[in-house]
Structures are given as C-alpha cells and as structure tokens.
Amino acid sequence: MATKKRLGGFSKIHVAKLKADNTFETPIPVTGAKEVEAELSYEQVQFYADNAMDYSDFVFNGGEGTLTVSGLTMTEYNTLFGSTVEKGGVLVKSTDIAPELALLFERKKLGTQDRVLYALYACKFAPPTISAKTMEGGIEEETVELKFTVRELPAGEVFYMV
C-alpha cells in the first residue's frame, strides 16, 4: 500500500526561545493558527575551469515568511517581539529587541490519524501592521499577519520535520 503523503490543515503553533548555547526553552503556545508560509532562499553557486562548469551547488541564503493568526494576546506580544506588558497593556518601543525563536506547528496527513510536525529554527518576528476596518452591514474576520525571518543555526540547521 502506498504511503499517505498529502497534507492538510495547520494547528498547534508554539514558539520556543533560542538560548545563547543554541538550545531552546520550553515551547509556549500561540493560539489562533490561520496560515503560515516560509520561503527559504538558496543561491546558486557555479564555478568554471577549463571552459566547463566544474562545481555547482545551492547555498542557503536565509529566508522569510508570514504567520497569520486570529489575533495576539499581550503575552504573545511580549514573547514574539520583546514588548513590555505593563499597566494592563502592551508598550511597544523602537528599542524593543525581538528574540530569536523556533516556530513549531503541525499539519495532518490526509486520510490518516498521523500528523507532520515542523520546527523552523532561528526565526525573528517583526511587530504587525496596525489596521482596522469599519463594519459595513456585517462583520468580516480580521487577522494579524506577522512577518518573520529565518536564519541557520551554527551547525547549519534550518528546519526539522517529522
């Protein structure tokens, strides 16, 4: 029988802070998973000698992506962007330093009870755009798009899936 490999869904987002020793803290949930997209950039490298290509490879050159969620709590602002939670609100400063995080999530293998787990290492999130819409005869869902970058860890790890 063929192995099921079609995927669907997106759920159970967690983030884990990257520590100085390149290990991670305990993962923390981020609720309201809607969508994630990460584009990893690989630069083609080619060298020629004796009028012919004698080396060709692709080298990881970082990445970027977008995580879409239904909204953010004050704690999630603190976790993702390094913003300060104070006096019942969130204070975002130009001097905030967003921590590097592993972005963890799962997808279902269609037609099975199995799932695929993902860990994108060394992600850094930018605070979201502030936007609002008037209600014109109905309510439309408004989501929050979080842009992030991805880099490799010192041993070259970019992501893991199982």
Predicted regions and their residues:
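Short, surface-exposed, charged/polar-biased interaction segments
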Residues: 9-10, 88, 141, 148
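Short secondary-structure transition/capping segments
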Residues: 13, 115, 146-150
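Structured, beta-strand-rich domain cores
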Residues: 55-121
